[in-house]
Amino acid sequence: IIMVNDTLIAVSVNWSNIIQYMYPDGRAISATENIPNNRRLATDGENYLYCTSYADNGYVAKIDIRTKEIVDTCHVGHEPEGIVYFDGRLFVANTGGYAPQTGHPYESTISVVDAQTMKELKRIDTGCINLYGAMARSGQFLCINSAGDNYDVAPRCVVMNMASEEFQVFDFPATYACAYGNEFYLLGSRYSYTTGNYNISAHVMELPSMRVEQGLGRYSGVMTEIDKMQSPYGIFISPYSAHMYVTDARGNVTNGRVYEFSASGELLNKYLLEGINPGKILFME
């Protein structure tokens, strides 16, 4: 889900061919329905929306938000996930996530695409496989999760300076991430097929120094509640109240929950949702 402009919200309906458009009051108005297996969204904040798709060996679709029609595409790596628009370029995280079922290997690259011409300019090899999930952005800095292979290759966190296209790798996952001020708040979920267990970690990264602190900093009290959750599924901080919200997918087949915490990490509310797997929150004034 993404705020395209002051009056339009776009939602990529996971594992479908549909992007649903709505007003901020929740009224659905139209849809783009011809992007198979669509994934993540980015916008230039003006006239265009960009969507990654796992179909056709992996591509990005460019949509004119005035007509809701696809006007161009660009092939990138296999199974592209996160996408961000920065300074006329698109940064696209390639996963190769279907590697276990197909003949291609996992991807470890970030495709850089000219947003105007929709031509791939380069691929930056991070050396970290399976760049899976939504990305967090703070100014020119981008936080990307490398999920590994759940066996021998451990998950990692990749942080890129999009202005210089330089990056740094950290030895912990950033499965769920958000930006607040000049910091990234990171929840890592490390799963092992060998043991069948999840391990949850938390870190705060200061920018631009990339200094890392274990835990959630001033929200340290949140970890007590996260440890009780069945399946932590997202972390978000309101830019208006500084409240932190953590979602719990629970069993992935029943109603999810959202936990609200104060700016000092005190639990304020728990919300039981109608839907399952609450993975995104959009804040509006």
Annotate each predicted stretch with a short phrase.
Residues 1-285:
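Predominantly soluble domains enriched in secretory-pathway, periplasmic, or organellar proteins
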